[in-house]
Amino acid sequence: MARERREIRRIESAAARQVTFSKRRRGLFKKAEELAVLCDADVALVVFSSTGKLSQFASSNMNEIIDKYTTHSKNLGKTDKQPSIDLNFFLIILLRTYTNSYAYIHLLLQLEHSKCSSLNEQLAEASLQLRQMRGEELEGLSVEELQQMEKNLEAGLQRVLCTKDQQFMQEISELQRKGIQLAEENMRLRDQMPQVPTAGLAVPDTENVLTEDGQSSESVMTALNSGSSQDNDDGSDISLKLGLP
């Protein structure tokens, strides 16, 4: 029994049309990929949906295949002088124009949006790991994950302590170097200062200063004190004598 041939016509329902387009597009790209692999052929497909969305497939590089087609068409034009070559070249230019049009830009925006979503997921995961390193949101972790986190924290602590010790040693070395420089500067300034005599004039002892006649000041003061005491004694005798009848 012969298979009934199905009539090909435009699908009226937009939803059904979109579903059919997606299925047929995947099948078309699959056949193109099989052709490229089985026959070692360069295959390029460009499809625009009714909404202007671009879909393309290339077994190698799309631009390289288009350039190859352009070169081949020009060579055929030189040999056969076919008038359709100019039309083919115009179609290639038009295809590249569409490739750089809004549909292609929309595709690039979709790719960038996908990359942005991936980066946001990575950022959220890194933020969660950072909070867990601070001891937050540990409820969902298993024992093995907690042990691994403990090892990571211990390794990080060892690196921090090692770095701190290295910085301490560098600061100590810097202080020692500055101390040596100050000592050298002190010696240089001391060498530049004039020599001051250390033996000065002797300070006289006031208690043992000699007078002009060779007597010391102590002996002179003793003599004066004794003389004054004798004068006081004489005066007292005179006053006593005058007072008697």
UniProtKB/Swiss-Prot annotation:
Keywords: DNA-binding, Nucleus, Transcription, Transcription regulation. Residues 109-199 form the K-box domain. Expressed in roots, shoots and developing panicles. Expressed in shoots. Residues 197-245 are annotated as: Disordered. Residues 213-224 have a biased composition (Polar residues). Transmembrane segments: none annotated. It is found in: Nucleus. The gene is MADS55. This is MADS-box transcription factor 55. The keyword Cytoplasm does not apply. One of its GO terms (molecular function) is RNA polymerase II cis-regulatory region sequence-specific DNA binding. GO terms for biological process: negative regulation of brassinosteroid mediated signaling pathway; positive regulation of transcription by RNA polymerase II; regulation of transcription by RNA polymerase II. It holds the Pfam family K-box. SMART domains: MADS. Transcription factor that acts as a negative regulator of brassinosteroid signaling. Residues 1-61 form the MADS-box domain.
